[in-house]
């Protein structure tokens, strides 16, 4: 198992017969048995591997009421030993219930909260899970319908890096959260109940890094192959950081490039007008453009490795055309069969 579980608990928020949301609080933590360990380890791996997460911090309470400090205050009491985990999670459940009550669409769900350690960091994982119906076959071969937690489709989840939060009060990225489909951020109510404010535009930072790398190789005396090797090295480093759940560190990345004979990237990135943070989370989908070109439009989808540009793939911006030399075998087969049938 990749995590060490300290506490875990589940509370239920559901509608009563009058349509009002109510909390059903569990009076003690979940027993750290095999089922809990397997579930939380799976959730940790799934969450860590999710691309496109947002990052934020506990906001300062303002007149607009968007940064409610109640969750952060309760968490501070829990970490300071003035509040037990069960009491803290119960307060959090009631805060979420109050926030959900502001919306007509809410059906509630199961609030899972867990404190655990992974490598050298302490985390608080918070997720609102839903139940999903499924069928099973009984011993007598009859079918039976039951409900189970839908762990494969988590849309409302956040994770607080407690170690970073307590060590660096100026950090604006110790809370990560899942963004919804089509690039939308997680439902506002889930961030609001925690008093979380988005602090780091991860995609923008990764896009800026990519631009800095492109400018760096363009201004260098590297050959075409060496330039692509540089791009690949940057992507490899950033992918490793993403898989480890660690931030990209510009100085560390520059040292990696220096080991490959590509000096001065740090001075180049910091000396320009790139406005890059020293550290920020990786976004694979953005940085993948260092290795691949891809696009979709007008019923055409095209994707190819960057190293093929100018060789197997010729782009002419004047005529707005792309010439592909050496059509992929499976595509060639489809095209040949279609032409024979016409």
UniProtKB/Swiss-Prot annotation:
The species this protein was found in: Shewanella baltica (strain OS155 / ATCC BAA-1091)
Places the protein is found: Cytoplasm, Nucleoid
Superkingdom of this protein's organism: Bacteria
Keyword Transmembrane helix appears in the UniProt entry: no
UniProt keyword annotations, A-Z: Cytoplasm
InterPro entries according to UniProt: Nucleoid_associated_NdpA (IPR007358)
Entries under Pfam families matching the protein: NA37 (PF04245)
Gene Ontology molecular function terms on file: double-stranded DNA binding; single-stranded RNA binding
Keyword DNA repair: no
GO cellular component assignments: bacterial nucleoid; cytoplasm
Record-given protein name: Nucleoid-associated protein Sbal_2534
Family in the record: Belongs to the YejK family.
Primary localization class, coarse: cytoplasm
